[in-house]
């Protein structure tokens, strides 16, 4: 089991203090080594590429926990069953979003295998990622999982 970073240290290269703070326990979750060094690392690299291309992204990352997830340290630390990443490109027109859910284990294959709608992440987490968007815009953006809009 690795300490999987929610905000990767590689995204904080502007400042040594920021890099150091990325190792705080508030920024890590128990993540299987196969995920942390495999599919999740590939997704983090892709997000960095998209950020360079689109100038700015909003990125939300977190665990998806549910009853029955395994635990560590005598039940004090839950091992999430999955992780999500919700990404918005707010500075491009039309605005676009994409979400990913990766099970906490080996995740092979391409990004499209794990792409999902923001609505699905909201359903699993109980969170509302873009509450200030007008309802029609929120519904349009959150209901689809169009990875093609990000790769072209």
Which residue ranges define each predicted feature?
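Domain-level detector of nuclease and nuclease-like folds
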Residues: 1-152
